[in-house]
């Protein structure tokens, strides 16, 4: 009986503080310091991928100018540099969803390598070996390049 009176009195105080309407978790969050900034709504957009382009959120630091590699860490063209450095448009993609989609950015990357190094695929395979670190992905791309060479396209 005493417990009911205490909890009933507590509800009355809260209802008087928040107003006469029903209580919800959103009402409680509005009263938190910061105005409920943790529970902001996130806008969901349809996914869209392009070869060589990462998705960058507005206001994110990932797309800010000057956040790339420092010039001192860039690889030089000297003997310690890679044998076949890819041009900027041939950098390996970083935005693969790994779902096995038919228009995979890695397959587009293999096609771009073949078009750039038009020597029958030898330099494309060498660049692939040098710039792709995942062994499973290398095997998949090797097979794709070899199939395209055999089919003549």
UniProtKB/Swiss-Prot annotation:
Residues 84-118 form the Oxidoreductase-like domain. It comes from the Eukaryota. Residues 55-87 are annotated as: Disordered. InterPro entries: Oxidoreductase-like_N, OXLD1. This is Oxidoreductase-like domain-containing protein 1. The lineage of its organism: Eukaryota, Metazoa, Chordata, Craniata, Vertebrata. The gene is OXLD1.
